[in-house]
Amino acid sequence: MLKKLAVCLSIVLLLLGAASPISAHTVYPVNPNAQQTTKDIMNWLAHLPNRSENRVMSGAFGGYSDVTFSMTEENRLKNATGQSPAIYGCDYGRGWLETADITDTIDYCCNSSLISYWKSGGLPQVSLHLANPAFPSGNYKTAISNSQYKNILDPSTVEGKRLEALLSKIADGLTQLKNQGVTVLFRPLHEMNGEWFWWGLTGYNQKDNERISLYKELYKKIYRYMTETRGLDNLLWVYSPDANRDFKTDFYPGSSYVDITGLDAYFTDPYAISGYDEMLSLKKPFAFAETGPSGNIGSFDYAAFINAIRQKYPQTTYFLTWDEQLSPAANQGAQSLYQNSWTLNKGEIWNGGSLTPIAE
């Protein structure tokens, strides 16, 4: 094993209390009332690209809560690479389920695993394949009209009340993590520039300015509810359009609502991913918030992906690969990805007591 937690902790002991700031510029979360640990992680993450090595956090998707979520993906990666991902993802929203109560599509039983992961040196990402409030449940891929979208945003309608019920249960799950001091990369309403989720576009690369405005209103509504109504001060907000569609920045709700901009990127050639410069133009830390191969599945070489990050996307702060057949463990180059000198793994960012120092 090329990297050992003991080495990292030795550096912590040497530099704690004496580490100078990486620059005079401190990067704060968009929530001014964020808890101190969340502030520390945000500033630390934002300055990762200034390092010469240990600068890109690895990440993996663990599955949908109470359906496919488990620690299997971590175990597969550890067996393949000797390392565990720095970031582990869970999705609270099982938006395809047809249930008697739309809130039954939300589940956060993965929290116990996420809390344990945090305490052992990891960082969780929570995403949402959100059920469609235009219907009693399910239908997360059912297109809706702009009129239906407006009804969802209106708290006096049946649709609006369904949305509020969904948000309340999601917030309950995030509150459990807050109460344990867990900072969360929170990624709602992803891939909005695609035509496959109800909150996004309805046609392939067909721009709809009204739709874009409605999306922004929905995103801000979720932000205000989580931050102001529920007091969730442990969230870092991730905005991640699809790399293979246009209008990546058009849906951007504004710099006051987003901490990290990323891409959901599935590709055959990691050197030809679209949207990197567009995301950088938003002046936020950048990540591949969801990623994996779209071709050569089972034989894709993840060594090429980390090399592409180094050569073409050097401002990347983290990547999160999908699971099952798209996982590095099911393809080639997993060890090259996790053992690369640029890659940060579990235990190398957070030890349950203090962040590793930022050393130039």
From Swiss-Prot:
Residues 1-24 form the signal peptide. It comes from the Bacteria. One of its GO terms (molecular function) is mannan endo-1,4-beta-mannosidase activity. The record marks 190 as: Plays an important role in maintaining the position of the catalytic nucleophile. Keywords: Carbohydrate metabolism, Glycosidase, Hydrolase, Polysaccharide degradation, Secreted, Signal. Its EC number is 3.2.1.78. InterPro entries: GH26_dom (IPR022790), Glyco_hydro_26 (IPR000805), Glycoside_hydrolase_SF (IPR017853), MANB/E (IPR016714). Substrate binds at residues 129, 196, 266. The active site is at residues 191, 290. Gene3D superfamilies: Glycosidases. Its main location: secreted. Residues 36-347 form the GH26 domain. GO terms for biological process: polysaccharide catabolic process; substituted mannan metabolic process. Transmembrane segments: none annotated. GO terms for cellular component: extracellular region. Belongs to the glycosyl hydrolase 26 family. Homodimer. This is Mannan endo-1,4-beta-mannosidase.
